Amino acid sequence: MAMAYSKISYEHREILLKNRPKDLYRISKKGTVPVLKLVDGTVIDESVDIMKWCIKQNDLDGWFEDNYTLQNRFIKNNDTEFKYWLDRYKYHIRYIENSYEKYQKEVEAFLIKYNLILQENYFLMGKKLSLVDVALMPFIRQAAHVDIGWFAQNFPALSEWLEKLKVSPLFLSIMKKYDIWDDSGEGIIVKWQ
């Protein structure tokens, strides 16, 4: 979403994680996605770092100008603590050391905080969309999809926020399906208007 927001054109290479091309490892030894390789050869292989780089290029609506420290704290908390519990909640069958209910309870603690904020605010930092909304949205969306009924019933403000983002022109513009890139050719050039 940050690339579309900042109108950053790029070469897109859609891959299957179960069949990662060798070229991915040549660009980043981590072999994870997303990865952004800049024209000067610089490689950015963390989602939030890619988002921040995009915003530094073109921050049309000031996504990262307000509550900078608080946004960074939310994002760090998401990427360390929330994601840990979210993975176990989503894949509870793999993580048998605790019950589904335990994982749901851990995820719930984060969702309660976000829901409380959104009962008072249109977005997580106030009246306008910011980087933290875009950074957390995919993870909250994943949490919601584990048990949509439970999520909607227990977190109405968060559900409304998520739905608002899911139907936004910005989100819809990035949801295009791409063919899987074969290791032998170029990717697809994506340009934002």
Predicted regions, residues:
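Short capping/connector residues at structural and topological boundaries
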Residues: 20, 49, 128-129, 156, ...
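Acidic/histidine-enriched, glycine/proline-rich intrinsically disordered or flexible terminal extensions
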Residues: 178-193
